[in-house]
């Protein structure tokens, strides 16, 4: 894994561990050159509810995060009737 990718994954994981939609939006804004413009606009312009769902889905898919933390997001999504990646 390249240094750049390692740094990105580390920053992403730190953002996900904060569990904040404001942090998610800031992260996407700061890294907008790495994402398709449609994804950037979707995250920056969506409702807080959609951003929160997206955050939890990202947490479930981030295998570097602690298992229990990921499972908390699985439970959060399941309780609300949403799918997950774990």
Segments (PLM) and residue ranges:
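Short terminal alpha-helical segments
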Residues: 1-32
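A general marker of short, structured functional hotspots
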Residues: 4, 23, 31, 52, ...
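Amphipathic alpha-helical scaffolding segments comprising HEAT/armadillo-like alpha-solenoid repeats
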Residues: 6, 21-26, 50-60, 84-86
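TPR/TPR-like alpha-solenoid repeats
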Residues: 27, 34, 46, 79-80, ...
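Acidic, low-complexity, intrinsically disordered interaction modules
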Residues: 31-67, 71
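Amphipathic alpha-helical binding modules
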Residues: 62-86
């Amino acid at each position: 894994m390249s240094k750049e990718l390692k740094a990105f994954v580390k920053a992403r994981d730190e953002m996900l561990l904060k569990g904040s939609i404001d942090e998610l939006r800031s992260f996407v804004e700061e890294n907008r050159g790495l994402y398709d413009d449609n994804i950037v606009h979707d995250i920056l312009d969506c409702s807080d509810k959609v951003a929160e769902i997206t955050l939890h889905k990202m947490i479930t898919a981030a295998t570097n995060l602690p298992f229990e933390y990921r499972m908390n997001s699985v439970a959060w999504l399941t309780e609300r009737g949403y799918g997950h990646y774990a």
